[in-house]
């Protein structure tokens, strides 16, 4: 059995879009990594959203935790190994050196357009 600490789970949601919806595509869908590795996750919007992009971490039985706001702005108390970049349609989330405690589901959310 593989320890869950060896895995970084990434959430990839696909929801059929109504006219005007912004569709977010995140990749990769799953990563198997070890502590110390650099992790990069990308998120692409179906249309430009400026810098209205947020990155979250969620662990089992816990609420999502905001890590990055406005594409690249760090959140107080979040370790500096977490960073984000990008604008418009293409965004990147990076964990510079993975730690065992980082095993979780990560996802992006756009905040430019609401249903």
UniProtKB/Swiss-Prot annotation:
Keywords annotated in UniProt: Adaptive immunity, Cell membrane, Disulfide bond, Immunity, Immunoglobulin, Immunoglobulin domain, Membrane, Secreted, Signal
Residue numbers spanned by region Complementarity-determining-1: 44-54
Database matches in Gene3D superfamilies: Immunoglobulins
GO cellular component, one term: immunoglobulin complex
Region (Complementarity-determining-2): 70-76
Region entry Framework-2, spans: 55-69
Entries under SMART domains matching the protein: IG, IGv
Residue span of region Framework-3: 77-108
Disulfide bonds: 43-108
Annotated Ig-like domain residues: 21-115
UniProt keyword Signal present: yes
Subcellular localization(s) per the UniProt record: Secreted; Cell membrane
SUPFAM superfamilies named in the record: Immunoglobulin
InterPro entries: Ig-like_dom, Ig-like_dom_sf, Ig-like_fold, Ig_sub, Ig_V-set, IgV_Light_Chain
Chain residue ranges for the region called Framework-1: 21-43
Signal peptide range: 1-20
Location of region: Complementarity-determining-3: 109-115
GO biological process: adaptive immune response; immune response
One Pfam family, short name: V-set
Quaternary structure, from the entry: Immunoglobulins are composed of two identical heavy chains and two identical light chains; disulfide-linked.
Function description: Probable non-functional open reading frame (ORF) of V region of the variable domain of immunoglobulin light chains. Non-functional ORF generally cannot participate in the synthesis of a productive immunoglobulin chain due to altered V-(D)-J or switch recombination and/or splicing site (at mRNA level) and/or conserved amino acid change (protein level). Immunoglobulins, also known as antibodies, are membrane-bound or secreted glycoproteins produced by B lymphocytes.
PANTHER family: IMMUNOGLOBULIN LIGHT CHAIN (PTHR23267)
Protein name: Probable non-functional immunoglobulin kappa variable 6D-41
Organism: Homo sapiens (Human)
Gene name, Swiss-Prot/TrEMBL: IGKV6D-41
């Amino acid at each position: 059995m593989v320890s869950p600490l060896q895995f970084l789970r990434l959430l990839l949601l696909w929801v059929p879009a109504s006219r005007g919806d912004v569709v977010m595509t995140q990749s990769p869908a799953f990563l198997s990594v070890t502590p110390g590795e650099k992790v990069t996750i990308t998120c692409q919007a179906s249309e430009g959203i400026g810098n209205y992009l947020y990155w979250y971490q969620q662990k089992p039985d816990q609420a999502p935790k905001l890590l990055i706001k406005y594409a690249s702005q760090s959140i107080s108390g979040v370790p500096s190994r977490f960073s984000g970049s990008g604008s418009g349609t293409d965004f990147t989330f990076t964990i510079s050196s993975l730690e065992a405690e980082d095993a979780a589901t990560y996802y992006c959310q756009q905040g430019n357009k609401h249903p």
